[in-house]
Regions:
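A short helix->beta-strand "capping" segment at the edge of beta-propeller domains
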Residues: 23-41, 71-75
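Beta-strand-rich domains and repeat architectures in extracellular enzymes and scaffolds
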Residues: 33-65, 80-92, 240-242
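Beta-propeller fold detector
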Residues: 34-36, 77-83, 120-123, 157-162, ...
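Beta-rich, blade/repeat-based domains predominating
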Residues: 40-51, 84-95, 124-141, 166-180, ...
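Conserved beta-strand positions in repeat-built beta-propeller and related beta-rich domains
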Residues: 56-60, 98-105, 140-144, 184-188, ...
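Short loop/turn segments that connect beta-strands within beta-propeller blades
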Residues: 69-74, 112-116, 151-155, 196-200, ...
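Blade-loop segments of beta-propeller domains
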Residues: 74-110, 116-128
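Hydrophobic, well-structured mid-protein blocks that either form specific transmembrane helices
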Residues: 108-165
Length: 255
């Protein structure tokens, strides 16, 4: 009987320790290192580096585009516009292809990463929001608290429940893979979360409040959305929908 009681006590301690560890979410804010122009007509949905250029996908019906952007100037050096019936969402490059989701059209597109030529359309079973890759799988969000790991034909390999302090965290939007972690914009907030891809736990939050100052905002300025990591320089860039600036940032731990 005593052994059973001892085992129960040990299990309780382990459970409490695990819960305590899970609750210790690190908190960061951003420090602007440098700012760049960003096309204020771009409703940014996907953003990632390809060499020294950025690939950006933009949304809204009648405004959706796939662009190669010079980050120094914010200007598109190559641009493709989608039919008005498509609302494009997140995008990423994997194995020589650029994958692009759509919001509610139930399709996803594949383009050649070098030429930007159209290659294929796939059916897609859910809303498209954000998209990134761990180098092997596509990782997609749909606005819920789940992330979906997919192969190159959009077949689901696994689903990951994202939790912060033990509770599901929804509204996960644009995604970026940085140093083995998944960074996600939380839609309609100034917060980015850093997610452990193995267990779905949020390990840190990034507070971006005030990143775009008031004098650069107008009636069309929308939410923070757009994370890009340059693996060559190890630099992180942030922007938003209809923002006039792109920012290189560093993380500063909150005290």
């Amino acid at each position: 009987m005593r052994w059973k009681l001892l085992i129960l006590v040990i299990l309780t301690i382990i459970a409490l320790s695990a819960s305590s560890c899970e609750a210790k979410v690190r908190q960061y804010k951003v420090k602007v290192v440098k700012e760049y122009p960003h096309d204020e007509m771009s409703y940014t949905q996907g953003l990632f580096f390809q060499g020294d250029k950025m690939i950006e996908t933009t949304g809204q019906y009648g405004e959706s585009t796939l662009k190669v952007v010079d980050p120094e100037t914010g200007k598109a050096v190559k641009k493709f516009s989608f039919a008005r019936k498509y609302f494009c969402e997140g995008s990423v490059e994997l194995d020589g292809n650029i994958y692009i989701l759509t919001w509610r059209e139930k399709v996803a597109f594949i383009y050649d990463a070098k030429t930007l030529e159209y290659k294929q359309t796939y059916s897609y079973p859910r809303e498209g929001w954000g998209l990134t890759t761990d180098g092997k799988n596509l990782i997609a969000s749909d606005g819920s608290s789940r992330l979906y790991f997919l192969d190159g034909q959009f077949h689901q390999q696994k689903a990951l429940q994202v939790k912060m302090n033990g509770r599901p965290l929804s509204q996960l939007n644009e995604l970026e893979w940085i140093d083995g972690k998944i960074w996600a914009n939380v839609y309609m907030t100034d917060m980015i979360v850093i997610i452990n891809p193995d267990n779905g736990n949020v390990e840190a939050t990034v507070d971006c409040t005030g990143l775009l100052p008031r004098h650069l905002r107008d009636e069309y300025t929308d939410v923070l959305n757009g994370i890009a990591y340059n693996p060559e320089t190890k630099k992180i860039y942030l922007t938003g929908k209809y923002w006039k600036r792109l920012y290189e940032v560093e993380l500063v731990e909150k005290k």
